[in-house]
Amino acid sequence: MNIWMTVLVLVVKAVVLALCVTLAVAVFLLFMRKFLAYFAYRVGPVKVGPWGVLQPIADVIKMLFKEDIMPEQADPLIYRLAPVIAFFCALGVWVVIPWAPRGSWWSSMADPNAGVLVILAIAAMGVYGTALGGWASQNKYGLLGSMRATAQMISYELAMAMSLLGVILMTGSVSMYDIVDAQRNMINLFPQFLGFLVFYIASLAEAGWTPFDLPESETELVAGYHTDYGGMRFGLFFLTELTHAVNSAVLSTTFFLGGYNPWFGLTMIPGFVWFLLKVILMVFVLYWIKCTFPRFRYDRLMVFGWKVLLPVAALNLVGTAIYVALWA
């Protein structure tokens, strides 16, 4: 009976998690449109529902009823699987995110001892959805876009992983809960500020967020690796990109802003609420970046990843190792 109850709880958590993430991404998209419109002196979505709040639902309905056209030269199986692989890899990161302290109903779905490694592994697997999507469509623009996305993800993932090594050294653990609990007195943003900058920039590049949205550069590649995708399959790729952007805010909150730990001694506010407030703060930073920075040139993007970000991450790791060895 206990085994079946455990399985039932996990299934319920998985369904609730998927619904919550999808809802969060829809809200993220709505506010992004409003924010971008405000910066461009426009009004944004206003037609669907009061103040345009139902616009994401209208977008989903529109994509669901669009005709699903597959190119004749495409590989049918891989063409259909690629967006699903990409989306579930983006969604899988949330399985080990500690939303609240251990024992809470809304705590993480899984609590592996090597949670950081699980996140890096799932993030690395997301490359397959992008690469296969561009290759399966047998379109030159899609193939070039997928090659760009794959090279970009692999390049910046090294810097992202190395920036987390400093956090792991200071915490002495690769468990997500241990990393969050170690920030009760002081968040990692201050001792690991260099690591935070590297991680945040690399996570934006992983997500293909501005100014790193080179894989779908409209002036060069039409729409990149999802040029030949339409309907809900295009919607899944679009949802994947937005989920990656939200993942960037969530992981930055967990690793560097203390996760569910309260700030300023305000312990009367639940940890789950603190977590959401910090994520919202990082999300608005994402909006601000998207409104402010132009797109990089592709060669400068790669040079920045290998010759700037990776050495800075290595320098941060060496400095952290010396500090831990001498004073910690």
Curated annotation (Swiss-Prot):
Keywords: Cell membrane, Membrane, NAD, Quinone, Translocase, Transmembrane, Transmembrane helix, Ubiquinone. It is an enzyme of class 7 (translocase). One of its GO terms (molecular function) is oxidoreductase activity, acting on NAD(P)H, quinone or similar compound as acceptor. One of its GO terms (cellular component) is plasma membrane. The chain crosses the membrane at residues 11-31, 81-101, 116-136, 154-174, 189-209, 235-257, 269-289, 308-328. GO terms for biological process: aerobic respiration. It is a multi-pass membrane protein. Its EC number is 7.1.1.-. It catalyses: a quinone + NADH + 5 H(+)(in) = a quinol + NAD(+) + 4 H(+)(out). NDH-1 is composed of 14 different subunits. Subunits NuoA, H, J, K, L, M, N constitute the membrane sector of the complex. The keyword Cytoplasm does not apply. NDH-1 shuttles electrons from NADH, via FMN and iron-sulfur (Fe-S) centers, to quinones in the respiratory chain. The immediate electron acceptor for the enzyme in this species is believed to be ubiquinone. Couples the redox reaction to proton translocation (for every two electrons transferred, four hydrogen ions are translocated across the cytoplasmic membrane), and thus conserves the redox energy in a proton gradient. This subunit may bind ubiquinone. This is NADH-quinone oxidoreductase subunit H 1. NCBIfam families: PRK06076.1-2. Belongs to the complex I subunit 1 family. It is found in: Cell membrane. The lineage of its organism: Bacteria, Bacillati, Bacillota, Clostridia, Eubacteriales.
